[in-house]
Design a protein with these regions (language model features):
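"…together with the soluble PPM/PP2C metallo-phosphatase catalytic core" -> "…together
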Residues: 2-273
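Cytosolic, membrane-interface loops and tails of multi-pass inner-membrane proteins
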Residues: 27-52, 275-307
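Membrane-interface capping segments at transmembrane-helix boundaries
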Residues: 27-30, 349-365
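N-terminal hydrophobic signal/anchor transmembrane helix of membrane proteins
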Residues: 248-255, 341-358
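Hydrophobic transmembrane alpha-helical segments of multi-pass transport and channel proteins
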Residues: 266-274, 322, 348, 352
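Alpha-helical transmembrane segments of integral membrane proteins
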Residues: 301-319, 327-328
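Long, low-complexity, intrinsically disordered cytosolic termini of multi-pass membrane proteins
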Residues: 306, 359-399
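Extracellular/periplasmic helix-loop-helix junctions in multi-pass membrane proteins
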Residues: 322-340
């Protein structure tokens, strides 16, 4: 493999992650039920029966075993070393492993004990800081306006922390339908694997293909009808892993294009998060207040069932990932053209789904005797939400 690319090590790493995750999910389900780490039906959740969460535990174990297989292959089978010096970074891989452990532990504790938002954010920041201290950071970028590079200095730390925390949360926020976050991360990780192989980053390639194997195995249990959810232990881990992989690739060249490509790959959850912020600001409510205006909610409201909605979002992700891969291989004029097409297409789909418009409800005004559309900041909205929930429970009891 030293002289020409061999995919046998990557296949072994992916297989190790797949098999481990596949075999441990049933054990994790029993553990989650025992610990009462269960998602019960509610007005914001799609599931109609209790589903165990904590699925990230199986994904985490899959990644751990995959890393062990890679290390053993390097020692005993002559595989090329993954933990090689980075051309721009001095990465401490034990510190990177510790950051993954911290982000998983944060999500797992939240799955079991329900952390406060600030506590969960603190865990994410800690994990990102550990990764930064371990050398995973954007220290320099190519100046897009003049020849040369821009050294970020101490700004590399806050910029990288914000980047990793943001990447972590965009996956967490879109985890709303069976198999949605898992499938999106599977598509993104495979795309990043192909880019890592082309750029010669064996560490990023091994980690991304391990993540792909774990996602593929978990999807067997998580696709509709799901028997287990990722939970925050999984969604936080997947988002953090994708962010870390993107930095391993991005930091190699520090070019503006290489900074944009991972954002295109993760375009769907980024659009979903950005539209949620705009939508809630327009409705005059806190950006942290949950609503039913996410992509998957809008598709369900359009009349699609869970499977159809998830498959449509998969198709959107594949389109963006294919575009990102193409941008990575062509010259500047074609890059601009591809990016423009992707941006216009995504904007048109977002507009069709009314992603940036406040969530509305019909409300019968007893004083005026008229049907009104109310936004979440109107007290009548909560009345209609409660009435809808009561009707849902009544239908459930009748069954």
């Amino acid at each position: 493999m030293a002289s020409s690319p061999s995919y046998i090590p990557y296949l072994c790493v992916a297989a190790a992650a797949f098999i481990t995750t596949f075999l441990t999910v049933p054990l994790v389900k029993r553990l989650a039920i025992k610990l009462d780490a269960v998602d019960y039906p509610s007005k914001r959740r799609i599931n109609t029966k209790p589903i165990p969460r904590l699925g990230g535990t199986a994904v985490f174990l899959g990644l751990v075993v995959a890393c062990i297989v890679q290390i053993m292959g390097t020692w005993h089978l002559g595989w090329p070393p993954v933990l090689v010096p980075h051309p721009r970074l001095h990465i401490s891989y034990p510190m990177l492993a510790l950051s993954f452990t911290v982000i998983y532990a944060t999500g797992a504790i939240d799955d079991i004990f329900q952390l406060k938002p600030k506590q969960k954010l603190a865990g994410q920041v800690l994990a990102a800081l550990i990764a930064c201290i371990g050398g995973l950071r954007i220290g320099v970028i190519v100046n897009p306006f003049a020849p040369g590079e821009i050294m970020l200095g101490w700004l590399a730390y806050p910029i990288t922390v914000v980047y990793l925390v943001a990447f972590t949360n965009i996956i967490n926020l879109i985890d709303g339908l069976d198999g949605l976050a898992t499938g999106i991360c599977g598509i993104a990780s495979f795309t990043m694997f192909s880019m890592a192989v082309l750029s010669g980053r064996i560490d990023a390639a091994a980690l991304s293909i391990a993540l792909f194997g774990a996602c593929l195995a978990f999807l067997h249990y998580n696709f509709n009808p799901a028997s287990i959810f990722l939970g925050d232990s999984g969604s936080l881990l997947l988002g953090f892993a994708l962010g870390s992989i993107s930095l391993l690739n991005v930091s190699r060249t520090a070019a503006l294009t290489s900074l944009i490509i991972p954002l295109i790959v993760a375009g769907v959850p980024i659009i979903d998060t950005f539209s949620a912020i705009v939508r809630r600001k327009r409705a005059h409510i806190s950006i942290g207040q949950a609503d039913k205006g996410h992509i998957h909610h809008r598709l369900i409201q359009e009349g699609y069932n869970q499977k159809q909605a998830v498959l449509l979002i998969y198709a959107w992700c594949i389109m963006l990932s294919a575009g990102a891969a193409a941008i990575n291989q062509v010259e500047v004029p074609m890059r601009v053209l591809i990016f423009t097409v992707l941006a216009i297409g995504s904007a048109a789909f977002a507009k069709h789904l009314h992603l940036f418009e406040p969530v509305l409800r019909h409300h019968y005004n007893k004083r005026t005797h008229e049907d009104e559309l109310v936004t979440p900041d109107d007290p009548a909205f909560k009345q209609e939400e409660q009435a809808a929930e009561e009707r849902k429970e009544e239908r459930h009891h009748r069954r």
